[in-house]
A protein has these predicted regions:
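Polysaccharide-binding and catalytic clefts of secreted carbohydrate-active enzymes
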Residues: 120-277
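C-terminal beta-sandwich/jelly-roll accessory domains of carbohydrate-active enzymes
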Residues: 411-417, 434-535
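Aromatic- and carboxylate-lined catalytic core of secreted/periplasmic carbohydrate-active enzymes
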Residues: 329-451, 458-474
């Protein structure tokens, strides 16, 4: 009987003190469409088949307040319906992105009637009183208008999709945050800044007595960022409660990273950033995930910050590039991520989307494995600077390296920029592993054997580059009394629809360097089944 792969993801929310069980078609192999990709039905009709062809199972799609309610009080769901219908036709799931009061900090997707009535819908202001293209989150009118449209949207989704489940998750707003100033200085915001800090935050801030925000932080931009984070979260919580009451599904907010040494106000500050997680959890307990949009260098570091016991990792945006595929393998392997989604995949070059398609092909197969959730697994991601990792699995030492640490590919030493290499590594049983990825080499040793290992510089033939007296002879006079790990075989395999490994070919001789390692070269995408033995 064909195995249906469905994963029940249980997420523990420490701030809610309860377990929330979320049903996902796992893993989310996503792609986010460019901002203007679904503003007309013709574009929707064109883009959905292309996303299916790229190997996605989920499309992240904007829902535009300005087009949904171009006239106040009158709602048009033509685009919403078309997205859902075309997704169903192409076997895709949908995550809607509510472009409401804020998109990348700015209120650019608010309707014109909202933008022009700044008396009803006041703007955030700088310290000098300059209004910004950012609606103030302290305005009840702003919240009421945003939430009214969002309520209509959620009701329509429930009518259209409840019981079918094409829409699997929802993002509320997009990259909320302050720019130009660390906090809002409008009159409404100033009054709140002079009010007492809510008691729910006293423990977070280390308070023992009642204080105002101003008494705590003064004009310090990092303190002002905390103030804004809590109040943005309180605003989002109102929309989250609306969603929960109408069509309950997983909810998340996404964050632009505080990278490159910038201070609050120089990036979209006060968003759901890792260092502000306590403020977001306190203000928006109905939000399930705080999700990073990762565009800067150091992908692993950013992902690691959001893979927390109280926050399962989901990467809704990442630069679509030739490294996207191995980055997807990393987050699913290392952090058991819910999903991964390169941004503007509909506008990306073929060499960039190719890596996504290849990686998603491997990831689908890995998650088709029977009992995949029970296997110990790791994610690997390497570049020219960070090119090696050692894993201790019981008493087996696994050395994982970038493929270009081997000498025989000329790109390794000719000054070329190294593409990133990465993989998922799974332990199937004792001395049995599965490696799925690209640009990776893995070797195995016993702990005892590793103590006797010496560094060797290899030549192009894979042997020692230059003969010299053995360090082992000089430094380790004792006899070798332990055991070594050997590679019994390395097979390229695929995973069939029943979750079973199917042999494709044996990788021996030059392909595993006479039993020294298992490897997948840069540009190749494979699944290798590795069996070890001891001698």
């Amino acid at each position: 009987m064909k195995k249906l792969v469905v994963l029940f993801v249980v997420i523990w929310f420490g701030w809610q003190m309860q377990a929330r069980q979320v049903l996902f078609p796992f893993p989310i192999l996503g792609g986010e469409l460019s901002n203007s990709a679904v503003t007309c039905v013709e574009d929707i009709d064109n883009v959905m088949p292309r996303m299916r062809a790229l190997g996605l199972n989920t499309v992240l799609v904007p829902a535009y307040w300005e087009l949904l309610e171009s006239t106040e009080g009158r709602f048009d769901f033509t685009l919403t319906d078309r997205v859902i219908d075309k997704a169903r036709e192409n076997g895709l799931k949908v995550i809607f992105l509510w472009f409401g009061a804020w998109k990348n900090s700015m209120s650019c997707y608010a309707p014109l009637w909202f933008k022009t009535d700044t008396k009803r819908f006041p703007r955030a202001m700088t310290k000098t009183g300059k209004p910004m293209e950012i609606a103030s989150c302290f305005s009840a009118n702003v919240l009421q208008a945003d939430n009214k449209a969002f309520t209509a949207f959620m009701r329509h989704l429930a009518e259209k999709d409840k019981g079918i489940g094409t829409v699997i998750m929802l993002q509320i707003e997009n990259e909320i945050g302050m720019l130009e100033a660390a906090r809002d200085h409008s009159p409404l915001a100033e009054n709140t800044y002079d009010a007492p800090i809510p008691k729910v935050l006293w423990k977070t801030l280390g308070l023992r007595q009642r204080k105002t925000w101003r008494e705590c932080f003064g004009d310090d931009p990092y303190g002002e960022e905390k103030f804004m984070a809590y109040h943005y979260a309180k605003y989002v919580e109102q929309l989250a409660q609306t969603a929960r009451s109408i069509y309950d599904m997983p909810l998340y907010v996404n964050a632009a990273m505080n990278s490159r040494g910038r201070q609050p106000g120089q990036y979209p500050s006060a968003g759901p950033l890792a260092h502000l997680a306590d403020f977001w959890h306190a203000g928006a307990p109905s939000i399930d995930l705080l999700a990073p949009d990762i565009y800067d260098t150091g992908f692993k570091g950013w992902a690691d910050r959001y893979a927390l016991p109280d926050n399962q990792l989901f990467v809704p945006e990442s630069r679509c590039c030739e490294n996207s595929g191995v980055r997807a393998l990393y987050v699913f392997g290392e952090h058991r991520a819910i999903g991964f989604s390169p941004f503007a995949i509909d506008q990306s070059e073929p060499q960039s989307t190719a890596s996504v398609t290849e990686a998603y092909r491997l990831i689908r197969q890995v998650f088709d494995l029977e009992d995949v959730s029970s296997y110990r697994r790791w994610g690997l991601l390497f570049d020219q600077e960070d090119k090696e990792r050692t894993i201790i699995d019981d008493k087996t030492v696994i050395t994982c390296r970038h493929f270009f640490t081997l000498p025989w590919d000329p790109r390794a030493t000719d000054g070329s920029e190294w593409p990133e290499g990465g993989a998922m590594l799974l332990r199937l049983a004792k001395d049995e592993y599965l490696l799925a990825g690209s640009g990776i080499v893995v070797s195995f040793a016993t702990e005892y054997e590793k103590q006797f290992e010496e560094e060797k510089e290899l030549g192009e033939d894979g042997f020692v580059a230059e003969g010299k007296p053995s360090k082992e002879q000089k430094l380790i006079p004792n006899r070798f009394l332990g055991k070594r790990k050997g590679i019994g075989f390395v097979d390229e395999v695929r995973v069939d629809s029943l979750g079973q490994l199917r042999y494709l070919r044996r990788e021996n001789g030059d392909q595993d360097h006479q039993g020294r390692h298992a490897r997948i070269s840069c540009g190749e995408w494979k699944i290798l089944h590795i069996k070890l033995y001891e001698y």
